[in-house]
Amino acid sequence: MSPHRAVIEAGPGAIRRLCCGADVVADTAVSAAALAAIDDQVALLDERPVAVDSLWFDALRSVAVDHRDGPVVVHPSWWSAARVEVVTAAARTLTRDVVVHPRSWLLRQASSGVSAATVVVEIAERLVLVAGAEVAAVARRTDAESVAGQVGSVIARMTRGITAVVLIDVPSTVAGAAFCGGSPRTRSWRCSQFITEPAQCRSAMRSTRGAC
């Protein structure tokens, strides 16, 4: 039994535990159904209707085992309040001692020892979220080069006159994220650091108090 909190990634493309040196992944069918139907009340699992909150409970329970304290649940920063509430409510059926953070919070731990300002770039299926002194979203409606150029302009505006570290989140579970994040236009995002989970997410968690 680990004395630390389990750190659980809830989305964008998987539900899994990131701490303790190895991935523990929720059942693929259950997690896929839970993520796909997070905006609904009922989902189909093996062609049968299942309550979405039940799917989230099962998925979170399977990856939170063997940890004494309540979990730290990390969700995509661009999720709506309603989506976050679905995950939070499911986690609280496991234990009332639950801590919920956006993904940008976890990624910022990677630069916790740096004095410069931090900007987090999260690449999602349909948008790129830029979180710094403010939060902005760039739609992924055009090619990767154009999107990278637009994101670079947003970063330049946010960091005008200051030194900043740019953390680029490139989830392996998001289609096209690696190509978008690896675009030549990203070279203009100065002081950039790519976070390709889960290994580098674990590095970030080492500075997270109370996690494995």
Regions found by a protein language model. Name each.
Residues M1-H75, A82-A91, A136-R160:
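Conserved phosphate-binding loops in N-terminal lobes of ATP-dependent enzymes
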Residues V74-S77, I168-D169:
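Short beta-strand/turn micro-motifs composed of small residues
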Residues P76-W79, V174:
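A generic structural signal for short coil/turn motifs at secondary-structure boundaries
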Residues V84-G176, P184-Q193:
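Small-residue (GG/TT-enriched) beta-loop-alpha framework at ligand/catalytic clefts
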Residues R206-C212:
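C-terminal single-pass membrane-anchor helix
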